[in-house]
Amino acid sequence: ETWGKDEYEEFAKDFLYADGKLEKTSKSLPSLSWYRILLERETWEPYAVYYQKLLSGIKCFPVVSDKKEKEGISFEDSWGMSRSYGGKRLHEGTDLMPPKNQRDTFAVVSVCDGVVEKIGWLELGGYRIGIRSKTGTYFYYAHLSSYAEGMKQGKTVKAGELLGYMGDSGYGAEGTVGQFPVHLHFGIYFYENGKEISVNPYEVLLFLENKKLIYSYF
């Protein structure tokens, strides 16, 4: 699926209209609402550029699917929902749930070509890895159980390359596991004038659903 310049512009307007929480209807590119008609070009144009960079750089779904499992990887639109661990905050990502609650089983891969910018433990994210794409988008993968061999800061990765395995690490001191079910927290960030902007990954994951890598886990 490819989009033209006008479609990226509509995508950006939808993003602003919904305070960053893009709806499933965004891809259908509905007629402009009065709100979007009144948006000044300088307000939405930067976001159109960001989405064009984001979508032109991603190539595959972030979790390798099991060809024998009918249910596969599931996810819901949970971006912006309330979280309480570590203080009241909003969920800045989408949680991808495996068909079986088994850590160190389901492979997590890079959705794009890029460079490992961050890696290691975070209290909230557990064992996490952050990839900066060639077009400047930052992709955040959290709660891993382990990393792929040789994965380190500064390493160049290709789309589809193994980053590590889905787990349940986080919410405590380094090595903490079992505070929640096994899953991958997947986040996307833009940077505008030095400010980090969290983007709802849900629509992007829908975009990537037909770009899954397949493997026989069981």
Please provide the spans of the model-predicted regions.
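Surface-exposed, glycine-biased beta-strand/turn segments
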Residues: 11-127, 159, 172, 213-218
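Residue-level detector of conserved, well-ordered beta-strand and adjacent loop positions
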Residues: 97, 132, 142-145, 158, ...
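Zn2+-dependent peptidoglycan hydrolase active-site motif and core
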Residues: 109-150, 175-183
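Short nucleic-acid-contacting surface segments enriched for D/E, G, S/T with interspersed K/R
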Residues: 150-158
